Amino acid sequence: MIIERLVGNLRDLNPLDFSVDHVDLEWFETRKKIARFKTRQGKDIAIRLKDAPKLGLSQGDILFKEEKEIIAVNILDSEVIHIQAKSVAEVAKICYEIGNRHAALYYGESQFEFKTPFEKPTLALLEKLGVQNRVLSSKLDSKERLTVSMPHSEPNFKVSLASDFKVVVK
């Protein structure tokens, strides 16, 4: 089965009305536009998304829906660093340091809380900066992702220089 478009999200439906099969993905697999996976029930699916979400697949995204059968995305829990900032200045420092490492950064549960995938050097940096943190198991859902850039990706727009030296995006 080849999936080319997302059909919706489970949060917009009553899952009890359907037979739901899941594709379990690690957080870093949610940004793939082309991939092959097996569902929990053993169905082979190929994903070739034409209009992939910029942030990637999210928890509950529906890949396939036919009558009462649904195949949806389940993002597996992974080891993450939960970061709790104390001030706006500390938020800026956290965003700068995590971004400087090109690491993924996600919104947390509260206003000054963030999550990033666990890496020992990042944990050591946060400790050195005196930033409150703890290592927990949690989902890193693309809809909560702060960073949008995708390494090694091609832009889906064309930039050219106009005769009056203005940048034109098409």
UniProtKB/Swiss-Prot annotation:
Location, primary (coarse class): cytoplasm
GO cellular component terms, A-Z: cytoplasm
InterPro entries: UreE (IPR012406), UreE_C_dom (IPR007864), UreE_N (IPR004029), UreE_N_sf (IPR036118)
Disulphide bridges: none
Annotated CDD domains: UreE
Keywords associated with the record: Chaperone, Cytoplasm, Nickel, Nickel insertion, Virulence
Gene3D superfamilies membership: Urease metallochaperone UreE, N-terminal domain, UreE, C-terminal domain
GO molecular function terms attached to this record: nickel cation binding; unfolded protein binding
Subcellular location: Cytoplasm
GO biological process, one term: protein folding
SMART domains assigned: UreE_N
Protein family membership: Belongs to the UreE family.
Its biological purpose: Involved in urease metallocenter assembly. Binds nickel. Probably functions as a nickel donor during metallocenter assembly.
Protein name: Urease accessory protein UreE
Species of the source: Helicobacter pylori (strain ATCC 700392 / 26695) (Campylobacter pylori)
Name of encoding gene: ureE
